Each structure stands twice: as structure tokens, then as C-alpha cells.
Regions:
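Alpha-helical membrane-protein topology signature
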Residues: 1-230
Length: 230
């Protein structure tokens, strides 16, 4: 029978995998031509790859930490897949250029993990680096909150992703508390705080929104231009 930390870590793993699948919608829209390529999602994916690599090595260097290791590896695998898909569009769908970029990225990921495990080899040191990099990933959400406050537009906050992220952070925070792992507690505490700030900001501007603007936007979405007969 599984103990409580293991159950909670599996919950966090499932939520984390769902969150890591979220770029699929963006890539589908890019494939259909509904959205254009930008560097921002690729930058976020690179940060995710870096973070996942660090956490995977952190848990690998410890004993009996299969579930968090599996969670980190799942995040690394999904982020790598989406990143490689993004490189395909970045290379202008040129196969030779794409293969060059793809092999370079995969090689860098392998070498980075090799350095963490074989050269550093100390899980505490790897954990310290992981915490710092994890904290840096909150810069983008922080800038988005500032933008929301300036424009007073609650739609800029993806509330579904925010709540899912909060659930994931809460799961791993509880896991970290139960196993008394400070490297897990710090980033997930900050993640939960950022998610709470995002949620309160969204709720505030949603409750104080201009309902007339909402009605106009809704009407614009319903109105579709008629096709001209040829």
C-alpha cells in the first residue's frame, strides 16, 4: 500500500503532465496558420527543459524517489518534444536546418545532464541550482501581472492554467513538507503564492470589468463576415 507522500506525488505528477501538454493547442493553431511563430513559447520551453533536467538529476541522485524522478522526466520529455516541434517551424520547415538545430539541442540536453550527474554529483548542489532556476521561471508571470494591472484586462491571465498550476504546486509543496525537503518546499511555496496573486488579480479585474465591453466583444465574436459569391 502506498504511503501519503507517494499518493500526493502521483497527484502532482498527473497534474504536471496535463500542464506540460498545454502547448499542444498553440502548436495546433500554428500548424493551421491561426497563430504566428514567436520566440516567447520557445524561450519558456527551454526554461522548462532546464528546470526539468535539474529536478530529474536531483531526484536521480537520491534513493527511493521514483515518482518525483518520473514526474521530472515526463516534463523533460514533453517539453523536449514541443521544443523540437517549435524548431521545425523556426527553421522554415527546412529538413536539413531542422535536423541541425534538433541534434544540437538534444546534444546540449544530454551534456547538461551528464555534467550534473557525473561531474557535480551532489544532489544538494543540484537542488540549489534547481531552486534558483525555478524561481527565475516566475519572472514572466510577474511581468504579466504588471501588464494586466496597467491594461485592466483580466483576459490576459489564463485562469485555467493558473488554477492547475496552483494545484500542482500545492501537491508538491505538501510532498516536500512530508519528506522534509527544503529544495521542494521553496519553489513550490513561491509557485503557490504567484498562483494566488494571479487568481486574485484575475478575480478583481473580472468583478470590476466593463460589462458593456464584454457584450460588444461577445457580439463581435458572433458576427462572421459573409462570403462573397463568385
Amino acid at each position: 500500500m502506498m504511503d501519503l507522500p507517494t499518493i500526493i506525488s502521483w497527484v502532482g505528477t498527473v497534474i504536471g503532465i496535463i500542464l506540460n501538454l498545454s502547448p499542444a493547442v498553440l502548436f495546433y493553431n500554428i500548424h493551421l496558420g491561426k497563430e504566428k511563430y514567436t520566440n516567447i513559447p520557445e524561450t519558456m520551453l527551454i526554461f522548462n527543459i532546464l528546470c526539468s533536467s535539474l529536478w530529474a538529476c536531483y531526484w536521480y541522485l537520491q534513493e527511493d524517489k521514483f515518482v518525483p524522478f518520473f514526474s521530472a522526466m515526463a516534463g523533460l520529455g514533453l517539453s523536449e518534444i514541443f521544443s523540437l516541434l517549435y524548431l521545425y517551424y523556426f527553421s522554415g520547415k527546412c529538413l536539413k536546418k531542422y535536423l541541425l538545430f534538433a541534434l544540437l539541442e538534444i546534444n546540449l540536453v544530454i551534456e547538461f545532464n551528464y555534467v550534473l550527474i557525473r561531474i557535480i554529483g551532489d544532489y544538494s548542489m543540484v537542488g540549489n541550482i534547481a531552486v534558483v532556476v525555478n524561481i527565475l521561471t516566475y519572472i514572466a508571470p510577474g511581468q504579466n501581472i504588471i501588464k494586466v494591472c496597467k491594461e485592466k484586462n483580466y483576459r490576459l491571465i489564463p485562469i485555467a492554467s493558473t488554477l492547475s498550476g496552483a494545484s500542482c504546486a500545492l501537491s508538491w509543496l505538501l510532498f516536500g513538507i512530508l519528506i522534509k525537503d527544503i529544495h521542494t518546499i521553496i519553489p513550490n511555496s513561491l509557485g503557490l503564492i504567484f498562483a494566488a496573486i494571479n487568481s486574485f488579480t484575475w478575480a478583481y479585474f473580472y468583478c470590476n470589468r466593463d460589462k458593456n465591453d464584454d457584450e460588444e466583444n461577445g457580439q463581435k465574436e458572433l458576427i462572421t463576415p459573409e462570403k462573397e459569391e463568385i
